[in-house]
A protein has these predicted regions:
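Cytoplasmic membrane-interface segments at the C-terminal ends of transmembrane helices
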Residues: 5-12, 36, 69-91, 120, ...
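Membrane-interface helix termini and inter-helical loops of multi-pass transporters
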Residues: 37-48, 120, 189, 193-198
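Short hydrophobic, aromatic-rich alpha-helical segments embedded in or entering the lipid bilayer
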Residues: 1-6, 174-205
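Alpha-helical transmembrane segments of multi-pass membrane transporters/translocases
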Residues: 21, 65-66, 130, 189-231
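Hydrophobic alpha-helical transmembrane segments of multi-pass membrane transport proteins
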Residues: 34, 48-86, 90-118
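Hydrophobic alpha-helical transmembrane segments of multi-pass membrane transport/permease proteins
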Residues: 11-39, 53-69, 158-170, 207-215
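A structural motif at transmembrane helix-loop-helix junctions in multipass membrane proteins
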Residues: 133-170
Length: 231
């Protein structure tokens, strides 16, 4: 059994983890879509009801994945240091942790997409599924970077939540003019288009793929650098 599989099984053995990964996205989608629609009108956005449900699925997977990435990296400092000193090496430790976290965040994204599909139906299901997974992996990267650099649990979790809230209310559909620096800007655009029955442009797909890859590579690099310093 490789280390990534071992790390994943370690988390999945805890029943509460699976409950969070599945129940939170479902609850968020069924309760928050209307709230997002109302906030959009207040902020000058133009988020339709079905698009709001799609965006809620993305944000549900993003919130869980950001939290997962943060606590997976911040709580494993001691164990990762021992693994590095035992000869595993910081690069392989980082690879295993990131892959395990990607598996868990994908489970959360799948639960969010399934809840979205059951609640509203999706005009472009594959587009929505890819965008929800992109949300999850983007915020997994955010959580891992913060968890690798910030040791305090309170400070780190507040940073992740602050980034999340800022991104929610400044992104496409929510604000009259989406902020160009919004982390999930392209993922939100794809989800809104899928929920509204529109086709996503090839340029948006390329941007979404590139942004997601950059987030994961950055998470890997920062985690490996942090593990190397600890060893």
């Amino acid at each position: 059994m490789n280390r990534a599989t071992a790390f994943t099984r370690e988390q999945l053995r805890m029943p509460f983890t699976m409950i969070l990964l599945v129940a939170v996205p479902v609850a968020f989608i069924f309760s928050a879509a209307g709230v997002l629609h109302d906030f959009s009108k207040v902020l000058g956005g133009s988020l339709a009801a079905d698009a709001a449900s799609g965006l809620a699925a993305g944000w549900a997977s993003a919130f869980l994945s950001g939290s997962l990435g943060y606590f997976a990296s911040s709580s494993s400092h001691g164990a990762d240091r021992r693994l590095s000193l035992a000869g595993v090496g910081p690069t392989r430790v980082a690879h295993s942790r990131i892959v395990a976290s990607m598996v868990l965040s994908t489970i959360a994204a799948f639960a969010a997409f399934l809840a979205l599909w059951l609640r509203t139906g999706v005009a472009h299901p594959w587009h929505s599924a890819v965008a929800v997974i992109a949300f999850a992996w983007l915020y997994l990267g955010v959580g891992v970077v913060v968890g690798s650099l910030v040791s305090g649990a309170l400070e780190g979790s507040l940073i992740v939540v602050f980034v999340f809230i800022l991104d929610v209310f400044s992104g496409p559909g929510m604000a009259a003019a989406p902020a160009p620096w919004a982390i999930s800007r392209t993922a939100s655009t794809v989800l809104i288009a899928a929920g509204s029955g529109r086709v996503t442009s090839p340029a948006d797909w390329v941007t979404l793929g590139a942004t997601t890859v950059v987030a994961l590579v950055m998470a890997f690099a920062v985690f490996a650098f942090s593990a190397r310093r600890r060893s």
